[in-house]
Structures are given as C-alpha cells and as structure tokens.
C-alpha cells in the first residue's frame, strides 16, 4: 500500500478520537453550556464533510407552506444558494422545508425515546409543495401540471430532510438497544471508550493506531431506498421513472462505501463517502413554490 494512502487513513482514525475527546470534554457542570459546546463541535464536524453549496445553521425551526412548524432543530443543513429563503422573527430563523437537506438532533449521554419520537414526528409532518414555475433549458417547468400528470418523468416529486441523531454514549451501544434511534435515518455515536484502548501495549511509548471512536448506523440499505425516501416522500412512486435503473440502484448498497481492511474500520472516512453519496442522490432541492408561501402569508392576514 502506498504510504500516503495509509497516512490519510490513519489520520482519519485520529480525527475520530479527537472528535470523541472534544465531545466528552467536561467544559463545565452547567448543562446548557456543555450542550452548546457539543453542538459547536458537531457543527464543525459537518462543515468539514459536506460540500460548500450547503449552509449550516444552528437552533432553527423548519416550516412548510401549510403552516406546520418543527420542533427546534439543533443543526440544519440546507441549500441557501438554490433556495435563498430564511424567514426571521427577531433572532429566530424559520427555514422552508424545500431547502433543507438534513436535520440533526444532538444528545449527550441519555436518550429519551418519547422526546426523540416527538421531535422526529415534527419533521415528518412537513410537506413540500410542487406549486413552482421555472424556466428550464428546453421548456417551462410548471409543478402543478406535472403533479396532474402532464409530465410523468419526474424523479423528484417531494423531498424530505435526512434525520440524523448524534449522541455520545460512554461505551459503544448495542445495535438492538433502540431508545428512539429507529426514528432516525442516520445515527452517529461518538463513544468515549474505544475497544482498542484495552489492547494497547502499556509497556511501550510507541504510538499505537486505534480503531476509532465512531459508530454510524444507516436506516437505508441501498441507493434505491435513498432515491425513493428523500425524493418521492409523497409515496407517489412512478415505476416508469425508476424502472430503468432501479436494479442497479438496488445493487449499490450503502455498505459498499465502507473503507476498511482486515483489522480496522475507518468509520469517519467511510461516512464522508456514504453521506455525500446520499446527498448526491437528492442533488438539488425542490424548485421553490413562491406562490404557495405567498398564499400562506395572505391566508394568515385574512384570518386576522
């Protein structure tokens, strides 16, 4: 193996250890301050791995044109260049669901299944709108007509954010221990105690490479699931659209993007490839439905 390839892989293992160390650092005995510190660490983590086309915001709310509002989102990953709309109320930010690629819930040691379910449900209730009009290269895209069947080649009919749970257990958790984790599409655990710690040679000063401190679980098994879940969230699946390449997408597993050798798993490096492949399956957000949001604001005025 080329030395620079080996060095890169080992560097990502060290980054895993550094991430866990920062998240577990006892900055204070004040819970809110500690939580704020950990959110900043997670924000920096995502900034390093997602493309620059995405912006990352902290402590925001996600809305749709039906006046639904999510619970507070610790971290939102959204496309501000493509859908440059953030509605503000003082310091509070409301981001339209059409722009949001992923939402992140950050937790520390303990997971409350009821709280996680309530939070996830507040994301799932949000619906994108197809009421958009856009000039494309060869035609005028009219979302409503497409919805009514004038164009039946649309792959992206309704998007929804990828739900990510980040938390920091002391030890690597058991896969069967749900505690609300099954409500999320991706679960990232930065556990404090690495199994390789127990195997280090205490009688030598030589640096020992470790297995890392991340465990990342995906709910989606293959790229076909990814395509359908995040681009066709309205469940109006058009078999004519996806049948041509559906078998190839189904064959390409999320697990195929893992980087590993006989003795080590490079979880962080793997996640960079896995997460960005999922983002590429979404690629661009929905065309923004300006008129639908205008109607939302106007209807509220009429109700007053």
Give residue ranges: language-model regions.
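Intrinsically disordered, low-complexity Ser/Thr/Pro/Gly-rich regulatory segments
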Residues: 1-72, 77-304
